[in-house]
Amino acid sequence: MTGRDALSDGRARSRALVPGGPSTGSRPRGFAITDLLGLEAELPAPEGPGPGSGCEGPAAAPRAGPGLGGSCPARGALPLGLGLLCGFGAQPPAAARAPCLLLADVPFLPPEGPEPLAPRFPGRPPPSAARQKRSESVSTSDEDSPSEDRSDRKASPAPSKRKKRRHRTVFTAHQLEELEKAFSEAHYPDVYAREMLAMKTELPEDRIQVWFQNRRAKWRKREKRWGGSSVMAEYGLYGAMVRHCIPLPDSVLGSGEGGLLGSCAPWLLGMHKKSAGTIRKAESEEKLAGLWGSDHLKEGSSPHQAGPQRGLEEGSPVSGVEDVVIDLSSSTRQETDRAQQGVGAQGRPDSEGLEGLQPGKEGAL
């Protein structure tokens, strides 16, 4: 038989001898050190309180003394912690004891301190101080958050504010006249033109720029008819006419009878007239080049044949500029012929050489 078995047998005998104690089979085994080691057999069961005693201090104090302090034989030999556990293990179950436990009965705790002592480490603050700091941080964060919310509320309405509307500029009749005149000259004036216009009208340059933007928008909305929407539309139509050899519409030609300003497409009509003049000029240059080549081929012809030819040219429907050019070319040819004849006379005066050589030349021809 081992020592543990002997202890368990002794515990059973002691329970049987104690009057009014609980039965051995009905009491469950606890998980305390005394229950696990079998030390409860050597502890006598304390007397239970009366039915009407309750939790009175004077009645409970003398009862707790022998249960915790003097009845444990191994109390002096065991360390401090094991002695405390031994005293707690010797107590009966909660059903047989008083309904409340007085912390003042424990000899290791002061009567005033309800909280158990916690081990303190040198580098770690006590739990009460940590809880206090945590509560302070929570309170400070709660106090700071409304101020941040208030600052956000103050900052958020600032962008949502609508900007003040700028006052409308009232233009005088003189200013409008100058602006309309500049708009008729150029729809997109540069900075220099706007600055000059600002000096004339005594208006700021940015106001003039805004006026031109509004005026261009108004002009685009108003000019909806064909050929009058914009200069770029007229330019595109003119390019299509040139590429595909499309004649100018009769409506544009008819509107230009009273002048370019009265036409529905003044720029297009002006470009058409310029192109027609360029074509006419090219044809006249070709005629002049042909006449000049024929004159060089007829080096041996007499100057008398130039007269009928000039008469025919005068009778032809050619412009006055072409007649002047032809006359200049014939006179130049006559002068060159006379110079050649003067060199071949060999000592004769120019007039006699010309008179003597003229009949011979005619006879040879």
Curated annotation (Swiss-Prot):
Keywords on record: Developmental protein, DNA-binding, Homeobox, Nucleus, Sensory transduction, Transcription, Transcription regulation, Vision
Biased composition (Basic and acidic residues): 1-12
Basic residues biased stretches: 160-169
UniProt-listed Pfam families: Homeodomain
Record localization: Nucleus
Binding region for DNA: 164-223
CC per GO annotation: nucleus
GO molecular function annotations of the record: DNA-binding transcription factor activity, RNA polymerase II-specific; transcription cis-regulatory region binding
Limits of the CVC domain: 224-277
Function: Binds to the 37-bp core of the locus control region (LCR) of the red/green visual pigment gene cluster. May regulate the activity of the LCR and the cone opsin genes at earlier stages of development. Dispensable in early retinal development.
Motif (Nuclear localization signal): 161-166
Top-level taxon of origin: Eukaryota
Motif annotated as Octapeptide motif, chain positions: 31-38
Bias (Pro residues): 114-128
Species annotation: Bos taurus
Biased composition (Low complexity): 19-45, 56-65
Main location: nucleus
GO biological process: one example: regulation of DNA-templated transcription
Name of the protein in its database record: Visual system homeobox 1
Tissue expression: Expressed in a subset of cells in the inner nuclear layer of the retina.
Record-stated family: Belongs to the paired homeobox family.
Segments of this protein annotated with the region Disordered: 1-65, 114-169, 294-365
